[in-house]
Structure formats: structure tokens, C-alpha cells
């Protein structure tokens, strides 16, 4: 600094007043001060962080659950944006005539164009479903047939009609495909045969154009071309759904370093899955929902059909669809799941890239693994219950944590949405010591053997991997979650409490009292006695571990609910269906699975976490603790004295606690 001052003070020596130019300056006197000055200007001021932001979303306090809060906030934002857009369009012109023309056009579009488009769509849907409605009488004819791999029996005509309905729903478009998938889970309303057939629904939607994808990606990433953001981008979608399609790409390190708020995981995985909504899908779904609402209101006028509460069911379905049309909600669901399972080694949810995601595009960490569907298909060839339990145990525990501890349940737990990765942990199972590359290579080798039809080699390799590595259960596609509000949670725990105490009659009464329309239920006492008989049948068993199937119990209850017109809350039914799916997958892996026993560690954690709270102020907590105590007593009744001694010795049972 002193040398710089000296050079500055002596600079007059090289200046000519007559020519007003500097004389030739010695290089030493010029370069060194200039370099110092440049260094100081570069380091005297803090660098500004460069951030990237897309549309953020926060839950609205008016929502009674986390996801409902996000939904309310999303809908309000959509209305505000539409209002602001139209206001800006009207006021941007100073010409009064143009302003009035634009006001006229907006009104004309809302009151003429949109209704006409909806009517045309209604005619299209009528052409698809009206012939099917006329063919319904065929379901009364034909011999009774049993559906393969199930206990469901139906007439041949009914099975044919169900197949035709599935084809019609696929033909009708994304809204009706989603409607069919939703109806397939509602065994409390529709027959088992119909629900089984609707479970086969898949999308026949054609992938949207690559140019549309590139445009949406450029907008989200704030780049002119995607090569500026990706090292590699697979231009062929890996999945095309009824609402969106999914691509895979690797974000460049240069792009990540450019923004301070893009954070990747500790493993450095820059591969991401990108979900992009189809063009014009919102307008089509909006029209379809209006048509469904009209049809539901019409059916509700038919005598004896009020118990279905179809208008309110369509309202719930509309919320479900609109939630899936804002991909930020799915990204925020992922963030919450990651927070809930942040301490888990064997359960993983993809990390969302919230700064890059918006209403139409969602970025999340790409999970490369083996699908649960493929694992279940090879279970018989593995023929080792202990190895299969290494997969089933964390899967069941994860679901029970969602249900009991977090009250935030993944509501679409079919095998296609569960992926298995393989990691190596330390001897205590507390840390992952294998790299992301090692996990990728293991999965890649397994998938390569599947593609090459090397079944024997695949099974042998899989058994070796299961023996030497720890399975990590990964859940994807979290767009639909179930979260019970306070009222529904209390109702669910009260029912579960009655079932755990094997008070069947009380369980039946609760199902009617706390249903949506108690007045429409028929033969209420008969229904309660049926539930009591069902529970007593379970109670009379020896209660050997594995003989009590809560899934069978709930499935039969849903059948009785349907026949007695007991309308359950949709969130409640979603939890029941999730339990059925869980036990269905779990028992394929472990035939001796008992959810009552599996829930004990979670209930213990539930009790210990809340022991510092005032339990008397929380009825749901007290009910859950009663269930815990009851199940602990039930388990102790089956233990030998030696096993009890082992529990005390290992501090799993504390008599003086």
C-alpha cells in the first residue's frame, strides 16, 4: 500500500503541462501499482450471491392439513395470477376501444367459448359411455367365475362389462383414467370385481413433443438452451402418464455452482428426474370435472342413491386432481418426507430441487434401483424368508411410522412406486459406508441380467447382494398423500382402539356414528352385529403370530360398509386401502407378517416421544397409548419365561419403568 501511495504522489513527474500527456513511464512504476489497485478493487467488496427462484408455495392456514393448506394456497395464487394478467392486458393500452374489446373478449371466453367447449366434450364422453350404460344388463347373465389369484367370484357377463368399462375409461382421457384408479381403491362403494379390473388401468396418452419439453425446461432453468444446464439429458421420456411425463438428466456442476441455493445430496448425485405436465391438460381436466359434477348431481336425485354422496365425492376428487396439477405440492411433500425420515438409513425419498421446480415442472433426485414389482415376481425363486424379511421389515416399518408417528402417509403405495437400492453400512447399521457409484453398479448389474433374460444368474446375484448389502427402500411419486385432520384422526384411532380390544359391536357403532351420512345407513344393528361376529372370529383364533390379518379384517369390513350403505370419509378409506396394500406386499415377502406385532416398536416410540406432554389434554394420544398397552400384553401372553428374561436383560422390557 505504501508503494502504491509513493507511485501516486510521484506521478506528477511524468506529466507534461504543455502537451497534457504522460511521458514514458518506467514499467516498474506502472505495472506494480496497477496490479495492486486491481487486486484491491476485486477483494474490497463482498461478492453477491447468485440465486435462482421459481414460484414458491407455502401452506395456507385455512387448510386443515398440510396438503390442504398447499392446495388452498395454490388455488388462490392461480386466481390472483389470472386476475392480474387480465388487469394488465386491459390497462396496457391507452385506447379505450381496445380496452373495451379486451373486456368483452374475456367475458365472451368465460361465458360462451368455455361452456361450448364443455358441451362438445360432454357429447364426446356421452358417445363413449352411453353404449356401455345400455350394455349393463349383460352383467346379470352367465355362470359364476373365479378371478385368477383372487377369491373374487362374479358372473361372466359382469366380468366382460367391467373390462369394457376399463377400456372406455382409458379412451376417455386423463381425468377418467384417474377417476377409474380412484374408484378402484373404493371397495366401500364398488364391487371387488370392478375394483380389481380398474386396478389394471393404464394410460394410453401419447407423449407430448420434445420442443414443448425444451421450452418448459429453459423457462424453469433460466437458460437459453438446456445444454447450458445439463451435462447429459435423455430426450426420450422414461415414463408417460395421463397428466405428465418424466425425463432423466444430469445437471452440470458448472450450472450448480452458478447458484448458491441449488444443493445436491452428500453423495454428489447430480442425476435428476424431471416431471413435466402435458400441454393443455388443465383446461381439459377442468371441463371434465364440470361434467362429472353435473352427472353426480343428476345421479344424486335418483331415490336410494343419496347414500353414495356422489357430489361430495366429486368435490374430493376435484381437489385430488388439482393437487396433481401443481407439481410444487409434490416437491414439498417430498421435502416433508425427507424431514420425517432424515435419520433413517433403510428408507429413502428423492431429494426435491425446490428452486428449480414450478407449477408445470418438478426436479427431483433420480433414484436408480430395482422395482419392488420385479422383486416380488422373483420371491419364489429366492425361497429364503429371512432374506425377503430384509426387504419387508423396513417397508412395513416405514409405513407404520407414516401412519402412527407422522400422520403423513404415501397414498399410492403400489409396487411400481417402491424401488429397492442396495447399500453397505457399518457394523452398527448407523451409517452408509458405500458410495453412490457402488450402489449404481450393483443395481445396473441386476437390471442388465433382467434385460438379457438371465433369470438364474439374476436370482443368484440378488441373493448374494441381499446377503452382503442392506436393502434401502425408496418411495417415489408422492403427489397423493393421506393426512387425517384432527376429527378424522380421532375417529380412526377410536376405531382402531375398538378393534385392538376386539370390541366388534362398538367398532360397528363407531363406523355408523362417525360416517358422513349416518341417517342413510340401513339395518344399523345388523351391521354392528356383523362386525362383532367378524371380530369374534378373529378373537377365537389362537393368536399365534401371523394368524391375525388386519388386512383381511378391514377388507371384509369395507364389503359390509358397502352393503349397509355406511358412507366413510374418503381420507379414512384411503388409510384403510393403504393398509391393505401394505399387508398385501408385506405378506408376499413374509407370510408370517403380523401388523399388530410390527406396530409395537412404533407405538413404543409414540409413547416415549409424548411422555413429556400433558396426555390428559390429548384424547387421541391416550387412545393410542391404550392400544400400545393392549398389544404389549397380547405379545407377552405368547412369550416364554426365557424370552421375557431376554427382553428384561436387553432393556426391551422394563418392569420398573
From Swiss-Prot:
What are the record's GO terms for cellular component? mitochondrial inner membrane; mitochondrial inner-outer membrane contact site; mitochondrion
Which keywords does this chain's UniProt record carry? Answer: Mitochondrion, Transit peptide
Q: What is its main location?
A: mitochondrion
Q: Where in the cell is it found?
A: Mitochondrion
Q: Which portion of the chain is the transit peptide?
A: 1-15
Q: Which CDD domains match?
A: ADCK2-like (cd13971)
InterPro entries xrefs: ABC1_dom, ADCK2_dom, ADCK_kinase, Kinase-like_dom_sf
Protein's UniProt keywords contain Mitochondrion: yes
Q: Which domain of life is it from?
A: Eukaryota
One GO BP annotation is:
phospholipid homeostasis
Q: What else is known?
A: Present with 2470 molecules/cell in log phase SD medium.
Which family is this sequence assigned to? Answer: Belongs to the protein kinase superfamily. ADCK protein kinase family.
Q: What is this protein called?
A: ABC1 family protein YPL109C, mitochondrial
